[in-house]
Amino acid sequence: MAALRQIAFYGKGGIGKSTTSQNTLAALVDLGQKILIVGCDPKADSTRLILNAKAQDTVLHLAATEGSVEDLELEDVLKVGYRGIKCVESGGPEPGVGCAGRGVITSINFLEENGAYNDVDYVSYDVLGDVVCGGFAMPIRENKAQEIYIVMSGEMMALYAANNIAKGILKYAHAGGVRLGGLICNERQTDRELDLAEALAARLNSKLIHFVPRDNIVQHAELRKMTVIQYAPNSKQAGEYRALAEKIHANSGRGTVPTPITMEELEDMLLDFGIMKSDEQMLAELHAKEAKVIAPH
C-alpha cells in the first residue's frame, strides 16, 4: 500500500473551502482512493455533502455528552458517506468560550489512538483559515498534514488570508515536512481573477493547482446536501472537480516552502493589476467629485 497522504484545505471563511474540498474528495474516491475527512472548522460543515445529511455530531459535542473523549468509541464519531468516505467533525466550543482549535487537537489525537488512520490512502483536514492560531495550525504544526492547499479567489480578503496561511506554513516548514501544495482559485468573477491567482501563486513560490469556474449547479447540489460529483456526475462542473482531484493526486512530493509577501507588496500587486487604486488616485478622484458638487451651476 502506498504511503498515507495527509493533505489539508485551508481558506478564509465563506470562500467555498468545504464545498471545494468535498467535491474534490468525492472525485478522488472515484479514482479508487480510500479517504478519511477530518473537519477542523467550528461550523462542522466539512462532511455534510459526503454524508447527504445535516452537520454530523462533533467529537467535542459527543465528548461533552459522554463525559470525556476517553468515554467515546471510534464508531461514535466516525460516519461513512459517499462511496465509503469516512467522516469526522472535530467541532468547537460555544462562541466566545475557549479555543476552537483545541477541538482539532483533541480529535486528531483521539483518531490516531483509535486506528482511524488505518487502511486509508488519504487523510484530508478541512481547516478554517482566517486565523492560523495554534489550534488551527495543529495539522501543520504537528507535521500531520504534509500538503496544504489554499482555497482563495480574486477578492482582497481571500488573497490576504492566502498570504497569511503561507506565513503559517513557512513557520513550520523547516521544523517538519509540511509544504504548500498549491492554490485553488474558486472563481468569484472579480476583475483579472485568473491572472491575479497565478501571480500570487508565483510570488508565494507555488502554483495555481486549478481554477474552479463559478457554476450554479454547485448551489443546486448543495441544496440537496450532495456534491456535484454525486448530483450531476456528467456535468461540466463535475469534470472540473475531477481535473482538480487528478492534479492533487499527481502532486505528491511536489509541494514547496512558501515565500509569503508583505501587506505592502500585496497592495502593490493589486495596484499593478489595476484592482486597487493608489491613495493619490483616490484623493484626486475625491477632490474632483467634491469640486463638481460645489461648482456653481
Curated annotation (Swiss-Prot):
CDD domains for the chain: NifH
UniProt modified residues of type ADP-ribosylarginine: R102
Enzyme Commission number(s) of this protein: 1.18.6.1
Cofactor(s) the record lists: [4Fe-4S] cluster
Pfam families: Fer4_NifH (PF00142)
Cofactor note as given: Binds 1 [4Fe-4S] cluster per dimer.
Keywords carried by this UniProt record: 4Fe-4S, ADP-ribosylation, ATP-binding, Iron, Iron-sulfur, Metal-binding, Nitrogen fixation, Nucleotide-binding, Oxidoreductase, Plasmid
Residues in the signal sequence: none
Entries under NCBIfam families matching the protein: nifH
Designated name of the protein: Nitrogenase iron protein
Natural source organism: Rhizobium meliloti (strain 1021)
